[in-house]
């Protein structure tokens, strides 16, 4: 077992934090952090929990015992959230945080919200300040952007409530992706629903009981889930259909034209079946992604920025093969398990792990859903999801001008096609595979933490750096 000190030190350095910065975030002295890293002292239980959460580290605790596991899965409702775009972590997350904070201080007549990290750097482009002010209205709200002060989590916001100029209360909130938020010292954002948290555990259980993944969902979730998933599917279809009708230019200043309708109607007399399939799937993905970029209602799957992948695949398959809504819901439930495993054991946030955590996760979910529609066995579904995620490893999150447009919209279309290819490959080669889905989730997490911050939704590197037509 590695020493606790070396694990803390390497995790801190991976996040680009000095000892003093980490100490300030934990409200301890830099000397205390130094003692932890030199193994001359151990963090107490409260600090241990904070370190796990802030630095995304995994280590054995004092006396050689494993610390409590926080990798317990909540409901797949947390994967599929119905809301307005363009960003789950920058609009849906702050909106949910504001609603919750307002309920804590209903007598407040004014608020102050400070955004840090990625929230500060791309919040203007995502409209974070607009949604915060709108949600907390009619109270007067001051929103400040602080891209300089370091915080252990890239999507951090401080909220303060006032009445008559006097402070009523404050809280630090983390927007951890997919519209999920953590308040204060919370470690888990939702109640535990599933008894397992890895694909290997779930697969073993399903094999023992001879059930499919969607049946595993039905066994553990409440009976109202299926009504919720039907609502999810209706909103997904609505986003596709609206997007196929819409024309014009997306907001934000990049002058990006909506292309879904053009793709959908661009038929050719000599178009092959394969070309038509690709064109339609891309049109459906563009449709949802353009609705998201316009701030319209979509469903996170698992995020706003990757919301076009799963609906594109499912909508195409239902239109082509006539799958019933019940079959589609089973596929969505299967996709939800995949997204939940990734969210629990790694991240679905571009600010934490780059675009691989968003588009890569969405592609894996879509591949698993398609495998469920085709009634593939659990091993083949696992392999399809693994292929889909593996070949997005290292993908950077570098939105031009901080908008969820370039390269985000095209990536949804490419990932939708890749999901279908992943299923085709998995159905033929599943018994020759070497890498498990759990392996690739762990690898994605490590890869994401190794990415420089400029490639994690800060709009400071990659395409965001080299192409900026509206740069002042």
Region annotations inferred by a language model:
Residues 13, 24, 53:
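Alpha-helical residues within the helix-turn-helix
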Residues 16-35:
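Short alpha-helical DNA-recognition segment
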Residues 44-61:
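DNA major-groove recognition helix of helix-turn-helix/homeodomain DNA-binding modules
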Residues 370-472:
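Functionally critical mobile loop/hinge segments
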Residues 237-354, 462-472:
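Accessory "access/gating" subregions that flank catalytic or transport cores
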Residues 135, 141-271, 279-280:
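C-terminal regulatory domains involved in ligand/effector binding and gene-expression control
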Residues 1-14:
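A short, Lys/Arg-rich alpha-helix, primarily the initiator
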